[in-house]
Amino acid sequence: MKILADENMPYVQELFGDLGTIETVNGRELTPEQVKDADVLLVRSVTQVNGSLLSLNNKLKFVGSATIGTDHIDTDYLASRDIPFSNAPGCNATAVGEFAFIAMLELANRFGGKLKDKTVGIVGAGNTGSAVAKCLQAYGVTVLLHDPVIQDSDPRDFISLDELIARCDVISLHVPIIKTGEHKTWYLFDETRLNSLKPGTWLLNCCRGEVIDNRALIKVKQQRPDIKLVLDVWEGEPNPMHELIPLVELATPHIAGYSLEGKARGTYMLYQKLMQVLGRDADKSMTTLLPSLWSVQLDIESIPNEKSLLKLARFIYDLRDDDELFRKTILDDSSKNDQVNCVNNNGFDLMRKNHQHRREFRALRLVNTGHSDVNWLTNLGFSGVGQ
């Protein structure tokens, strides 16, 4: 059996190696010729899987995408050919949640005020949005939710988008791309909606770039520097509008979900599904793939100080490093080369390929040397919190 896998998917050899021959490929440049002999195709969001890509293949047994979203997959086409498909919903939700939480701590540290005193609105309350809410609520932050798709079947309280914008100091976006219909999210934040943001609003986008009209965002941000931006996703990836980048407070190349646990979880979920399709038992464990936990002793009485919490979070992941590298890679390189799109493309994807996957909070085992209540740190995700 021939297994064709994106070169940036981790643990493919460890999980799929005894099922057949593995060939890794550049997912963004995948061609029908490369796919024609594959029995299994494993992709990420950079690969458009459709009739054109699979036009030369008549033996495909399974397509798996190690992603939450499926907007890059023509699921109707796969169904018409009876090709089993699976994605990995929720695989990197914890990573995205912690990324957004850390970004908010960074903004609070940079611009003053406390995150705990703010009201945060989450647009899209699925796996990733709920993970953000979990972190914030563990820390004691007031959270409001907007999600018209699930509000009728979900017991949580929801409000309209207009009300959320009017009431919230921070807005974090976690919706899939929907191009048409009642729940359209393409340019959900257009120029009018961007101009309706409260003074001093923090706006974070960790879902899809086109949820915000980036050209309108440039115009609004130039007129309203009070708005603070965290962008992990960009319209037109892998070629972000380079004039937008200097206007953004924290900028990264679509790596919010890039934790080691999240990436491993995505690959492992596809392994489980393929074994089910093949009628075989999944006899491998994800826990054997990951490095051991770190242990840190500290007096947790000091952590309620927000700067101390940020310091602890930076021990796991210092977002400033990726922000600095992103600006250097995209802006510095493009200024030296007339072929901006080519440079941005290479730099953007190269950053994603070479990204050192951070660990999630659970990888850090805290040993409490004080005598304070530590349940909130457990709820935030840290391991082994106790005395």
Swiss-Prot record:
Gene3D superfamilies per UniProt: 3.30.1370.170, NAD(P)-binding Rossmann-like Domain
Active site annotation, chain numbering: R208, E237, H254 (proton donor)
CDD domains xrefs: ErythrP_dh
Subcellular location, principal: cytoplasm
Gene Ontology CC terms: cytosol
Pathway per the UniProt entry: Cofactor biosynthesis; pyridoxine 5'-phosphate biosynthesis; pyridoxine 5'-phosphate from D-erythrose 4-phosphate: step 2/5
Annotated S-S bridges: none
Quaternary structure and interacting proteins, as annotated: Homodimer.
Name recorded for this polypeptide: Erythronate-4-phosphate dehydrogenase
Phylogenetic classification of the source organism: Bacteria, Pseudomonadati, Pseudomonadota, Gammaproteobacteria, Alteromonadales
Name of the gene: pdxB
